[in-house]
Amino acid sequence: MEAKIEKISELSKLLSVKTRMSDDLFHLFGKFGIGHLLSRLSLEKRDGVSASELILSLCLFRIVGESIHRICKHKIYELSNYGKNCFYRMMIRPQMDWRRLMNHFALRYMCLLRKYGEAPLSDTTTCFIIDDTVLEKSGVRMEGISRVFDHMKGRCVLGYKLLLCAFFDGKTTIPFDFSLHQEKGKQGNCGLTRQQLKKAYHTKRNTGNPDYKRFQECKMSKIEVAMDMDGRWGYMRSM
């Protein structure tokens, strides 16, 4: 299957012009209506900074392959005039529903495909894809951290397992749900020493916040969570 390079190249053209990349990509992301979703979640602003701008900036950081620290320190591409703490505070907000945000992106993307005549034909074969991958980390005090088996390296590494659920519409693979998992191991200690477990980060959570559910899922099996994902988004099969 050949990708439509002429359309993908539009993004690369934006990336090649540093002085206008930020404005052009913010306009492109504006089609996804992130501000309306954040408004419904009561997350419009924090410390006087637009939540939608922070989230879109985080997306741009991934596109250019730079860290928050480096972007803010060197003002690369003039993507943001905010300090790095604004981004860190956004990422750890207990009320932030990252799953809902990701699903919003996916559904809005499908709507845009239909709007511009790029939606797959009705007889196209579609499917769900559920797969896991390793997110290797170095911080042993991170909450929920454990030693997980990396099939690529053939050994256990410190980190998390990322479970990702995506929808393949015959042309595009669209991720729309995810969860992070730890592995208890044979000894039930996550592969950590007693001292490391004691020093790991812990916090009390409000059971009504999305971060509470994320942490509960971290301790569940991937199969259980995958079944929950299928139950939540099974209606997408008919789209």
Residue ranges and their predicted role:
Residues 1-239:
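Conserved, well-structured functional cores that handle cations and Mg-NTP chemistry
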